[in-house]
Protein backbone atom coordinates (compact mmCIF):
# COMPACT_ATOMS: atom_id res chain seq x y z
CA UNK A 1 0.00 0.00 0.00
CA UNK A 2 1.49 3.36 -1.03
CA UNK A 3 2.00 6.05 1.57
CA UNK A 4 -0.62 8.49 0.35
CA UNK A 5 -3.26 5.75 0.32
CA UNK A 6 -2.37 4.98 3.95
CA UNK A 7 -3.27 8.48 5.06
CA UNK A 8 -6.13 9.44 2.73
CA UNK A 9 -7.60 8.80 -0.69
CA UNK A 10 -7.92 11.73 -3.04
CA UNK A 11 -10.85 11.16 -5.34
CA UNK A 12 -11.69 13.29 -8.34
CA UNK A 13 -15.47 13.66 -8.35
CA UNK A 14 -15.61 17.02 -10.11
CA UNK A 15 -17.30 17.49 -13.47
CA UNK A 16 -14.82 17.93 -16.30
CA UNK A 17 -14.94 21.27 -18.06
CA UNK A 18 -13.23 22.74 -21.09
CA UNK A 19 -10.31 25.03 -20.33
CA UNK A 20 -8.34 27.24 -22.70
CA UNK A 21 -4.59 27.33 -22.11
CA UNK A 22 -2.48 30.00 -23.80
CA UNK A 23 1.03 28.70 -24.54
CA UNK A 24 4.18 30.49 -25.57
CA UNK A 25 5.39 29.42 -29.04
CA UNK A 26 8.47 27.57 -27.74
CA UNK A 27 6.38 25.80 -25.09
CA UNK A 28 3.79 24.76 -27.64
CA UNK A 29 6.51 23.46 -29.97
CA UNK A 30 8.02 21.37 -27.16
CA UNK A 31 4.64 19.91 -26.15
CA UNK A 32 3.78 19.08 -29.74
CA UNK A 33 7.05 17.19 -30.13
CA UNK A 34 6.24 15.24 -26.96
CA UNK A 35 2.74 14.42 -28.21
CA UNK A 36 4.19 13.05 -31.45
CA UNK A 37 6.76 10.99 -29.56
CA UNK A 38 4.15 9.54 -27.21
CA UNK A 39 1.48 9.19 -29.86
CA UNK A 40 -1.13 11.16 -27.93
CA UNK A 41 -2.88 14.48 -28.44
CA UNK A 42 -1.48 17.81 -27.27
CA UNK A 43 -4.25 18.17 -24.68
CA UNK A 44 -3.42 14.74 -23.28
CA UNK A 45 0.25 15.72 -22.88
CA UNK A 46 -0.80 18.85 -20.99
CA UNK A 47 -3.11 16.78 -18.76
CA UNK A 48 -0.31 14.30 -18.04
CA UNK A 49 2.07 17.09 -17.03
CA UNK A 50 -0.50 18.81 -14.80
CA UNK A 51 -1.48 15.52 -13.14
CA UNK A 52 2.19 14.79 -12.50
CA UNK A 53 2.75 18.18 -10.90
CA UNK A 54 -0.29 17.78 -8.64
CA UNK A 55 0.82 14.26 -7.69
CA UNK A 56 4.30 15.50 -6.81
CA UNK A 57 2.83 18.29 -4.69
CA UNK A 58 0.41 16.01 -2.85
CA UNK A 59 2.62 12.98 -2.30
CA UNK A 60 5.33 14.59 -0.13
CA UNK A 61 2.74 15.77 2.41
CA UNK A 62 1.46 12.24 3.00
CA UNK A 63 4.89 10.66 2.73
CA UNK A 64 6.39 13.15 5.16
CA UNK A 65 3.64 12.57 7.71
CA UNK A 66 4.16 8.82 7.64
CA UNK A 67 7.94 9.14 7.63
CA UNK A 68 7.69 11.55 10.56
CA UNK A 69 5.71 9.05 12.67
CA UNK A 70 8.12 6.26 11.80
CA UNK A 71 11.21 8.41 12.47
CA UNK A 72 9.91 9.66 15.82
CA UNK A 73 9.18 6.13 17.01
CA UNK A 74 12.61 4.96 15.86
CA UNK A 75 14.28 7.90 17.63
CA UNK A 76 12.59 7.00 20.92
CA UNK A 77 14.07 3.52 20.90
CA UNK A 78 17.47 4.74 19.72
CA UNK A 79 17.66 7.41 22.42
CA UNK A 80 17.03 4.71 25.01
CA UNK A 81 19.75 2.50 23.49
CA UNK A 82 17.29 -0.17 22.35
CA UNK A 83 18.35 -2.01 19.19
CA UNK A 84 15.97 -3.24 16.49
CA UNK A 85 16.01 -6.85 17.75
CA UNK A 86 14.92 -5.78 21.24
CA UNK A 87 12.46 -3.33 19.74
CA UNK A 88 10.78 -6.23 17.91
CA UNK A 89 10.58 -8.13 21.22
CA UNK A 90 8.93 -5.19 22.96
CA UNK A 91 6.37 -4.78 20.16
CA UNK A 92 5.78 -8.49 19.55
CA UNK A 93 2.32 -8.28 21.11
CA UNK A 94 1.24 -6.12 18.17
CA UNK A 95 2.56 -8.55 15.57
CA UNK A 96 5.65 -6.47 14.87
CA UNK A 97 8.62 -8.38 13.48
CA UNK A 98 12.14 -7.32 12.56
CA UNK A 99 11.13 -7.08 8.89
CA UNK A 100 8.44 -4.52 9.77
CA UNK A 101 10.88 -2.36 11.70
CA UNK A 102 13.28 -2.24 8.77
CA UNK A 103 10.54 -1.27 6.32
CA UNK A 104 8.68 1.99 7.14
CA UNK A 105 5.68 1.17 4.92
CA UNK A 106 5.20 -2.28 6.49
CA UNK A 107 5.62 -0.83 9.96
CA UNK A 108 3.04 1.91 9.38
CA UNK A 109 0.56 -0.62 7.95
CA UNK A 110 0.54 -2.46 11.31
CA UNK A 111 0.78 0.64 13.49
CA UNK A 112 -2.27 1.41 15.63
CA UNK A 113 -3.18 4.18 18.04
CA UNK A 114 -3.10 1.67 20.91
CA UNK A 115 0.50 0.80 20.03
CA UNK A 116 1.46 4.47 19.76
CA UNK A 117 -0.01 5.22 23.20
CA UNK A 118 1.73 2.23 24.77
CA UNK A 119 5.08 3.26 23.27
CA UNK A 120 4.50 6.77 24.63
CA UNK A 121 3.78 5.34 28.08
CA UNK A 122 6.95 3.21 28.03
CA UNK A 123 9.08 6.31 27.56
CA UNK A 124 6.95 8.90 29.43
CA UNK A 125 6.28 10.74 26.17
CA UNK A 126 3.20 12.60 24.94
CA UNK A 127 1.67 10.35 22.25
CA UNK A 128 0.59 13.44 20.31
CA UNK A 129 4.26 14.21 19.74
CA UNK A 130 4.66 10.83 18.04
CA UNK A 131 1.85 11.54 15.57
CA UNK A 132 3.11 15.07 14.93
CA UNK A 133 0.32 17.04 16.62
CA UNK A 134 2.59 18.81 19.13
CA UNK A 135 6.23 19.75 19.58
CA UNK A 136 6.05 19.04 23.31
CA UNK A 137 7.68 15.68 24.05
CA UNK A 138 6.33 15.57 27.59
CA UNK A 139 4.84 17.87 30.20
CA UNK A 140 6.90 18.44 33.38
CA UNK A 141 3.64 19.66 34.92
CA UNK A 142 2.45 16.04 35.04
CA UNK A 143 4.74 15.47 38.05
CA UNK A 144 4.27 18.44 40.37
CA UNK A 145 5.64 19.11 43.86
CA UNK A 146 4.86 22.78 44.55
CA UNK A 147 2.61 23.06 47.63
CA UNK A 148 2.78 19.29 48.08
CA UNK A 149 6.33 18.37 49.03
CA UNK A 150 5.03 15.53 51.18
CA UNK A 151 3.00 13.97 48.36
CA UNK A 152 5.96 14.19 45.99
CA UNK A 153 8.29 12.66 48.60
CA UNK A 154 5.80 9.83 49.12
CA UNK A 155 5.77 9.27 45.35
CA UNK A 156 9.56 9.04 45.32
CA UNK A 157 9.53 6.58 48.20
CA UNK A 158 6.95 4.37 46.45
CA UNK A 159 9.01 4.42 43.25
CA UNK A 160 12.13 3.45 45.19
CA UNK A 161 10.39 0.28 46.39
CA UNK A 162 9.34 -0.62 42.85
CA UNK A 163 12.66 0.41 41.32
CA UNK A 164 15.67 -0.22 43.55
CA UNK A 165 17.97 1.78 41.24
CA UNK A 166 15.85 4.95 41.31
CA UNK A 167 17.99 8.05 40.82
CA UNK A 168 16.79 11.59 41.47
CA UNK A 169 18.63 14.39 39.70
CA UNK A 170 17.88 17.83 41.14
CA UNK A 171 18.46 20.14 38.19
CA UNK A 172 19.16 23.87 38.20
CA UNK A 173 20.55 26.39 35.74
CA UNK A 174 24.13 27.54 36.32
CA UNK A 175 23.42 31.14 35.35
CA UNK A 176 23.07 32.31 38.94
CA UNK A 177 23.89 31.02 42.43
CA UNK A 178 21.29 30.08 45.04
CA UNK A 179 22.43 32.96 47.25
CA UNK A 180 22.19 35.52 44.48
CA UNK A 181 18.77 34.26 43.42
CA UNK A 182 17.47 34.81 46.95
CA UNK A 183 18.81 38.36 47.23
CA UNK A 184 18.17 39.93 43.83
CA UNK A 185 14.87 40.64 42.16
CA UNK A 186 13.48 37.79 40.11
CA UNK A 187 13.72 39.61 36.79
CA UNK A 188 17.49 39.81 37.17
CA UNK A 189 18.22 36.43 38.72
CA UNK A 190 15.50 33.93 37.91
CA UNK A 191 16.69 30.47 38.94
CA UNK A 192 14.60 27.40 38.16
CA UNK A 193 14.98 24.11 40.03
CA UNK A 194 13.34 20.82 39.07
CA UNK A 195 13.72 17.05 39.15
CA UNK A 196 14.50 14.25 36.70
CA UNK A 197 13.77 10.68 37.80
CA UNK A 198 15.50 7.73 36.16
CA UNK A 199 15.21 4.00 36.80
CA UNK A 200 15.31 0.65 35.03
CA UNK A 201 12.09 -0.43 33.34
CA UNK A 202 11.42 -3.75 31.64
CA UNK A 203 9.05 -4.62 28.77
CA UNK A 204 8.81 -8.18 27.42
CA UNK A 205 12.20 -9.02 28.87
CA UNK A 206 13.93 -5.92 27.47
CA UNK A 207 15.45 -3.57 30.06
CA UNK A 208 16.07 0.14 29.50
CA UNK A 209 16.41 3.34 31.52
CA UNK A 210 13.17 5.27 31.83
CA UNK A 211 13.14 9.01 32.53
CA UNK A 212 10.51 11.28 34.03
CA UNK A 213 10.88 15.06 34.00
CA UNK A 214 9.15 16.70 36.95
CA UNK A 215 8.04 20.24 37.66
CA UNK A 216 10.47 23.18 37.65
CA UNK A 217 9.85 26.18 39.89
CA UNK A 218 11.71 29.35 40.92
CA UNK A 219 14.16 29.31 43.80
CA UNK A 220 13.68 33.10 43.90
CA UNK A 221 10.12 32.75 45.18
CA UNK A 222 10.18 32.09 48.91
CA UNK A 223 7.23 29.66 48.90
CA UNK A 224 8.77 27.53 46.11
CA UNK A 225 12.02 27.62 48.03
CA UNK A 226 10.28 26.50 51.20
CA UNK A 227 8.68 23.45 49.59
CA UNK A 228 11.92 22.54 47.84
CA UNK A 229 13.78 22.55 51.16
CA UNK A 230 11.41 19.97 52.60
CA UNK A 231 12.01 17.72 49.58
CA UNK A 232 15.76 18.20 50.03
CA UNK A 233 15.40 17.30 53.71
CA UNK A 234 13.56 14.10 52.81
CA UNK A 235 16.02 13.08 50.07
CA UNK A 236 19.00 13.72 52.31
CA UNK A 237 17.41 11.64 55.08
CA UNK A 238 16.83 8.64 52.78
CA UNK A 239 20.06 8.94 50.80
CA UNK A 240 20.99 5.33 51.58
CA UNK A 241 17.82 4.25 49.76
CA UNK A 242 17.43 6.83 47.02
CA UNK A 243 20.40 7.97 44.97
CA UNK A 244 20.18 11.75 44.64
CA UNK A 245 22.49 14.30 43.07
CA UNK A 246 22.30 18.04 42.46
CA UNK A 247 23.40 19.04 38.95
CA UNK A 248 23.68 22.36 37.11
CA UNK A 249 23.38 22.90 33.36
CA UNK A 250 23.37 25.95 31.15
CA UNK A 251 20.12 27.86 30.73
CA UNK A 252 19.42 26.47 27.25
CA UNK A 253 19.35 22.90 28.56
CA UNK A 254 17.13 23.79 31.52
CA UNK A 255 14.81 25.78 29.26
CA UNK A 256 14.57 22.78 26.92
CA UNK A 257 13.66 20.47 29.80
CA UNK A 258 11.09 22.90 31.18
CA UNK A 259 9.46 23.32 27.77
CA UNK A 260 9.37 19.58 27.08
CA UNK A 261 11.59 19.95 24.01
CA UNK A 262 14.66 18.03 25.20
CA UNK A 263 14.98 14.29 25.78
CA UNK A 264 16.31 13.85 29.34
CA UNK A 265 18.42 10.90 28.17
CA UNK A 266 20.47 13.25 25.99
CA UNK A 267 21.80 15.37 28.87
CA UNK A 268 23.85 12.59 30.46
CA UNK A 269 26.95 13.39 28.43
CA UNK A 270 26.54 17.16 28.57
CA UNK A 271 28.79 19.41 30.61
CA UNK A 272 27.39 19.87 34.11
CA UNK A 273 28.38 20.88 37.63
CA UNK A 274 27.36 19.17 40.86
CA UNK A 275 26.11 20.62 44.12
CA UNK A 276 24.87 19.22 47.44
CA UNK A 277 21.20 19.38 48.37
CA UNK A 278 22.09 19.10 52.09
CA UNK A 279 23.62 22.58 51.90
CA UNK A 280 20.26 24.03 50.81
CA UNK A 281 18.03 22.62 53.57
CA UNK A 282 18.62 25.40 56.09
CA UNK A 283 16.78 25.50 59.42
CA UNK A 284 13.94 23.23 58.41
CA UNK A 285 12.12 23.54 61.77
CA UNK A 286 11.60 27.25 61.17
CA UNK A 287 10.82 27.02 57.46
CA UNK A 288 7.82 29.36 57.50
CA UNK A 289 7.83 29.80 53.73
CA UNK A 290 5.36 26.91 53.34
CA UNK A 291 1.63 27.43 53.76
CA UNK A 292 1.42 25.07 56.70
CA UNK A 293 2.85 24.87 60.21
CA UNK A 294 6.50 23.89 59.56
CA UNK A 295 6.79 21.82 62.76
CA UNK A 296 3.68 19.80 61.94
CA UNK A 297 4.82 19.40 58.35
CA UNK A 298 8.26 18.26 59.51
CA UNK A 299 6.66 15.67 61.81
CA UNK A 300 4.84 14.17 58.83
CA UNK A 301 8.13 13.85 56.97
CA UNK A 302 9.86 12.32 59.97
CA UNK A 303 7.13 9.69 60.34
CA UNK A 304 7.54 8.86 56.64
CA UNK A 305 11.31 8.60 57.05
CA UNK A 306 10.94 6.30 60.08
CA UNK A 307 8.63 4.01 58.09
CA UNK A 308 11.29 3.78 55.42
CA UNK A 309 14.00 2.93 57.94
CA UNK A 310 11.96 0.07 59.36
Where are these predicted regions, by residue range?
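Long, charge-rich C-terminal accessory regions
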Residues: 150-299
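Short Lys/Arg-rich basic patches
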Residues: 1-26, 35-36
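DNA major-groove recognition helix of helix-turn-helix/homeodomain DNA-binding modules
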Residues: 113-129
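Recognition helix of helix-turn-helix/homeodomain-like DNA-binding domains
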Residues: 14, 18, 91-111, 118-120
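Short, basic amphipathic alpha-helical segments that act as recognition/interaction helices
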Residues: 40-62
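Short basic helix-loop element that most often maps to the first helix and adjoining turn
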Residues: 37-41, 67-92
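A detector for short, charged/polar N-terminal pre-domain segments
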Residues: 6-10, 56-66
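Short, charged recognition helix plus adjacent turn
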Residues: 133-157
Amino acid sequence: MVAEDRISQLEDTSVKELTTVRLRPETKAYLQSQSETLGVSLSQVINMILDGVVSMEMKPASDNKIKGIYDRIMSLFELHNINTVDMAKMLSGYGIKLSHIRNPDKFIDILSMDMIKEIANWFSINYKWIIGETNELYSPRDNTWYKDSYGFSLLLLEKSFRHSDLKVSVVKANNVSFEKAEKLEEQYSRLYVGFILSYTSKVNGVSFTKYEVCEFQRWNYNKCRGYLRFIFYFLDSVRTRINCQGVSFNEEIVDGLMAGRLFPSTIKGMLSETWFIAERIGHIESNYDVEINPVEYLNRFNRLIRLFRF
